[in-house]
Amino acid sequence: MINNLYKMFLGDSPNWYKNTIIAFLVINPITLLIINSMGLNGSFIVGWMILLEFIFTLALALKCYPLQPGGLIAIQALFLGLTNPYSLLHEIEHNIEVILLLVFMVAGIYFMKNLMLTIFTKLLLTIHSKTKLSLMFCFVSAFLSAFLDALTVTAVLIAVAVGFYRIFHLANSGLAFSTSTHDYQDDSSLSEAGIEDLENFKAFLRDLIMHGVVGTALGGVCTIVGEPQNLLIANVAGWEFIEFMIKMAPITVPVFIAGMITCFAIEKFHIFGFGNHLPLRIKNIFHEFNDYEIAQSTDESRLELYIEMLVGIFLIIALALHLAAVGIIGLGVIILLTSFKGITHEHDLGDAFKEALPFTALLVVFFGVVSVIADQQLFTPIITFVLAQDASNQAPIFFVANGVLSAISDNVFVATIYINEIKDALDLNIISRDQFDKLAIAINTGTNIPSIATPNGQAAFLFLLTSSLAPLINLSYMRMVIMALPYTIVLSIVGFIAVVINL
């Protein structure tokens, strides 16, 4: 009985992983009990332990989806009294826009995948230089993220990459492009040539996706709509779209230029896992797919593309003008696309929600860990230290502190805590309005730029790590950290220098 229960626990995860999670769950309450009995603040120490344990589950996302082990740790935190359901609900309410975005916008993008795949296939076949293609992915992702939203753009990138992978898999399994039932996660049907090319193709897709997702961070920091915390900071500071962009520009423009130079350099010199080219044999598959699409094109399929294009234009305008919360716009996209494309059966709609809902559940679990950080004031000593510094040094220190904390927790949460702290300091006349503006800029850039160091720093990175694409292209937590490392180093240094010079 116990053996069967152990086998079922966390499914087919390795035994050492299961044992580690069990050890966490046993050690946490014992540690809390012992430290409290010594008259020390056990909740603070165990709170940090739970944060690090949750990061561990994210780091090993390919061994076991983090929802289950991370969820068990979060449930234990509730039972140990490190937080409570009301604090968790408060965090969920605070981040409801992000949750709506994941539920509806990602599903909306699913119904636009034909248009996305057509556009990106043309780009893949038109741009012959891998370096130019990488720069294009990075630039377009940055541009779109500045006016749309980093998570939305990441959803597009994932949809496109999965589409590319499916085309490759169909061709190398000897199947027609029209086959809809093929399981592209099963490599047993691949030809010998396909197996040889598979790793090269995975590496090529990893390159493009990582350039693209870093691009979302480069663009996302620039405007109010780019990242959820930007809107929060702008609301507290009372900045409109243009004012926000102008205030951030002295930091964000040099960082963006440095990002594009970094993209060029790592592709040119084939470092940090980049510089993987698309073999000619694989490129020919996409030429064949393009020819197939043209040959199969009918008035109805062309009309579908036009509908997707018009709804895409509506999406861009609605997001750029912030006509509603991103998730509500996403729901509008679903309704428009499914209505005019005639997708009215429930099971056809259900497929669109499969990608995002597991991650949405994981994000809610993450908010449980965030509520532990808030209730146990895990970051308070750092905040107190920063606010105690000389005014001229506060902005650079805020930039660094925000970056470090965002990388290990979540940039939305860190930005929320810091912006509220400096708003309280402004209201109490501890700092001037000019100093408040400088610190708000440092908080925004600090939470957005260095947080690319780890996947848990940015929601877009975490979404990519836990998506169905990550295991397909062997994109693990540590591989993401290593591939993001040149960007992390260069952008953090350039951002820090820009903060020191301009603030």
Which ranges hold each PLM region?
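Hydrophobic transmembrane alpha-helices of multi-pass small-molecule transporters
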Residues: M1-A107, N114, I242, K247-P381, ...
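Membrane-interfacial helix-loop connectors
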Residues: L60-N95, L144-H211, P228-A249, A356, ...
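Hydrophobic residues within the alpha-helical transmembrane core of Major Facilitator Superfamily
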Residues: I75, F139-F143, V214, L218, ...
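Transmembrane-helix boundary/entry motifs in multi-pass membrane transporters
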Residues: E93, L125-L133, K202, A295-D299
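Transmembrane alpha-helical segments of multi-pass membrane transport proteins and ion-pumping complexes
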Residues: L102, V106-N114, T118, K130-L133, ...
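Membrane interface segments of multi-pass transport proteins and intramembrane proteases
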Residues: I119-K130, E346-D351, V386-Q389
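Short hydrophobic alpha-helices at membrane interfaces in multi-pass membrane enzymes
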Residues: S134-C138, R206-I209, M309-L310
